[in-house]
Amino acid sequence: MTSQLKVDKLQGRTTAGSISVTSEGTSVETNLQQGLCKCWVKFDGSDSTPAYHDSFNASSLTDHGTGEFQVFITNDMGNDDYATFVTSTFYSGMSSEAHTIVGSVRIFTADDPGYAYYQVAGDLA
């Protein structure tokens, strides 16, 4: 028989903001909160007014000109040292440059991309 756990909220027993999960097949543990994606978006940068096609924890999107976009994060990050991952389709390679601040990130492409995808990992405020 398969076990099933149904809950609406998880909270650490000894530390409310920390839950350890045993990795698959071993006794190694990882922190659940650290492993979650904190923000992600998908948008079409070639649209005259780019908008999210889908997103999580992202409020608005600003087009600052050819190949330069700013994603605003709904629930701010704890600092500006979070990790970002950006990629795109079409023929516009993504720059490795991203300007991160607590509540948003500016991303750069070689040109206006077709679809652009962006993810954030790190600590929320």
Regions found by a protein language model. Name each.
Residues G78-A98:
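Terminal beta-strand-rich extracellular "head" domains
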